Amino acid sequence: AKLINYMGNTPETNQGGKLISVNGKTNGEGGGTPDTPSKPDTPATGEGLTIDGTTVTLSNAAATTTGTSVELNLNTLGLANQAAVETVKFSDGSTVTFDANGQENGPKFYTNTKGVRVYANNKLIFKGIKKIKQIVMTCDSYNGINYVGNATATIEFSDKTATYTNLYTESTGGGVQLRVKTIKIIYAE
């Protein structure tokens, strides 16, 4: 059977296809039970990731001091509606790059939500002018849904760089979009 990646996040087989191997086992050997990841009880999850209402906070445990900060409102940059967003610059020279990370749906700016929609497995790569202690993002809420990204998202800090991935590992769907409106970088000093 041919495996097709439908809509960038749903693996399917072609119609009439037959599955001939499960977990590396074939014809009667039995594939056993695949490992299933545990689901978090609360939306606040992952090391360095906290979700509270429409606020997503990314914290660097290795940064113990607090310095200056810079804030960016994505709605004030003159970005084109429904257009892909790549790199935007903060007033102090720090940047955030919105990366599709190989996914069919990449980050786009929408005027009606006043921010950038970040889809499943997309990345945000922050490059600070100094070591980053924390990143605070305010996000959109619509019809009772807080668009704060997936609870399984990851954050990785490395000196002046931080990489957020809106990780989604389920076989169907795309999880929760991150609809980021403002971003505040707090530096360590």
Please place each PLM-identified region on the residue numbering.
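Glycan-recognition and processing domains
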Residues: 43-117
